């Protein structure tokens, strides 16, 4: 015992075979925790002893012990239950081959049943062997006393082979003979920063927080590893060999008429500035009031023909444009142009500058004062940077903007077989190479089609691309996690995208095929460079308003920077996180609805009604499909901290006062069964050219790599409806479907961060119907005053009786609850006995009549699982799956 206790307190050094003593060491437990959290394991697996919350995977506390214990698993291939040792080999298999053996629940209501095959298999491309070992050492600490592994395990860091050129460094973004502009979060700046790399090896960062340059460096431009790995959220690194000349406060900060530095810290603090986040979260002054008092705004940037940006912003009555150039010899020139309605001051930070000169205005006591002007005038400030310039290594090749042929190939089986209804097939669209001919991470999360057939594809980290005449071409450089796109013209030359920091209008104003104008439509909301602060949308209504969704934040290092409202993960850092918002045609920002958690889908149905898809979690018992209506509350109270005058301590926003104000959802999407992370909708408006699903909403799931069909109805003023599986085994996480002019369905997918069952990090697949084959399936389910009417896509065979068919149906039901715990178990689960059934005269539907249906209060606000267990012989010679299923949410019974 004494020996074991001593080992528990030690830091264990472990040297790799042949490792040199001089190699860098790292703590594998600490690294394992980072990987565990960044891959989202913490969401599905509890690490707390005896945690009662409902999770989709087993509790890891007390699982991997010093003396390995037994645990029970189920082998899906044959249904066999057996016991295995929870040792290192089992751990490795549970990560690499997670579907080979499913853990059996050891406690609670699900004790004795196997967890679902939800966790994807993590290949080495997603979690390296080195990181896998680190996670092992981390999970070994999740036990009591001597059964736990050491709290610190020091390992040797493996040296990466030297790169022949910057193009060989993974995720390195070099600069050739054209200026490059990227939206990134850099250390020491806000998450809304714009990084600019010049061809001469000089780079700088313009930060909209101060409307000023904040960082200057030479050498390598950027390396986007931190943004392209797992869930991102860490500050982006500078390029290889970078040397910093200037960083910290603003270099040339505009001043208000009162002489104060323009500072938007309240809505965009510096990356990982916990102190500022806590300050403004608990401050009673509202964001809208701070914006009005500051009376300034960032307006975007315009690119010259060589790619150099001119930054546009407004301070009071003055609209200004600023350009920055850094010469080979380190001379910095900042030009400010504008028609000044009032005198404009700038505070200059002179640290690291020499030979400061101005052309126009007066520089005195560190303030550059520009006079009122009746016309547009340009004034310049120049200075020399201290220190020598660091050269960039020569590139073996330059950029190539030549359009690339779009290649399509039959979709190969992924981690699971691709299952689609008979008559449907899938093609994979091969992603384009980047400008330097390298394979790139290409996550197509925004797709739209112009009237002339141009397809616009926005991505998380690879920029915005267009497909014209069967060829890919890059339209706009790196956007910051773009998750949606709307086309404003007929050709795809004028678009609006979402990015984490803002809603942006992007324009090709000179017709050369490349975007040159980036207009900030809206950034009047909080963005803290948090990995979970996604901006979903936008979508546009007929009046020209743009609607978008702001996810809650998740700080993996602190529970004080966001208000989690008693929950374990997601919370608001203020600034309308957890809200649906809109921006009007004249640029006015308007909060629209609140109570959102992690909404990942939004769209207008063919009748013009707005809907959104919500992800399961705190205050959201399971994922759901809901009409999005102005002024309504949707369940998660964290976002209420953005209401006027509210702070986390305000009694007015505590859950008991809001739980009965919930806008009820229309359709539950059962967690672990159909959807864990539902994405964007696409309605079938093809007029039958995609099959028999006219008017239905197609929604994918990012985790399960599935495609679903949703049909809703309104009964007695209540929304409700059914969801039916359409496809399984897509290549990655399904996020953005869109119907193309040829009536096929193009599906943008991403598996990064929230690993998907499909297994791939990214994918773009096209689903095509052969135009003739209609498989037998459940088309949808509707409510009847006596039960449920199950509608089929093909008529039942003439010899099938109602009683015989009803005997093959199994109907069960349950309900979910919404509280601060992560998700909800299935409450009051029961099997429904059928008192009768009736087949319609056209044999396209059957009405199932549960015993006692409608009597008492036990029927409503429940989800009903309708399972046709054996379809053999039911639909003649029509192709059909062995079993059919649908889930129906019942909120009201027809009278």
Predicted segments with their positions:
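Gly/Gly-Pro-rich "capping" loops immediately C-terminal to redox-active cysteine motifs
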Residues: 33-37, 47-100, 116-126, 473-474
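Detector for the c-type heme attachment site
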Residues: 44-51, 65, 122-124, 140-141, ...
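Beta-propeller domains with acidic blade repeats across secreted/periplasmic ectodomains
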Residues: 158-163, 394-774
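Short, surface-exposed alpha-helix to beta-strand junction/turn motifs within ectodomains of secreted
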Residues: 791-835, 869, 884
